[in-house]
Amino acid sequence: MNIEQLLDRYLQLSELKRPGYIESLGLPLPDSTQQLELAAGTPLAPLLVCIYNKVSGTPRQCKREGLIDFIPGFRLPHLREWPAAYEAFKLVHGEQWLPLLFDGDKGYYAINRETDEVAISFLDEFAFIDTISLNALNFLQTLVANYERKVYSVDRYGLLDYDERREGEVAREINPDVDYWMEE
């Protein structure tokens, strides 16, 4: 599967676990690519363009708590918020990194516009950035597998949850050359 097909599959799996999730992300804005380019310049990561050509993202004030997370603990920033997220991330890690997901505080998943690597970072006093996938395809394959292999679940409160041990197992299998997943 290509990036678009994997994203569609991930959204379908999210919808099965949390009905209403896709609708909560909103329709894409007609000028989404232009807005991203205006904020971050070019080239844009294809995954970022694919996402925002399908949806507009999770609004900061999402009405249903169970629909906030794209992955456990991280939401897809709404397109209107994305430029501010980019600026905050750029100050620490440079203009090559484009935010994908945000935890609402200092945590980000980001994609490198030059290498297509996906990384996690917390903009705290350490400001580390750790690669979690060598490319967007592996990143999406990992997310899809997390649903298909029951790593992701919905807890009794309707919130997206996950099994941390199983997440590492699945990620190591799909991303065998990434040190982040080799840590126990």
Where are these regions (language model features)?
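Extended hydrophobic/aromatic-rich secondary-structure runs
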Residues: 59-62, 77-81, 142, 151-154, ...
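Short acidic-glycine loop/turn motifs at beta-strand connectors
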Residues: 112-115
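Compact, glycine/acidic-enriched structural inserts
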Residues: 121-152
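Acidic, proline/glycine-rich low-complexity IDRs
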Residues: 148-184
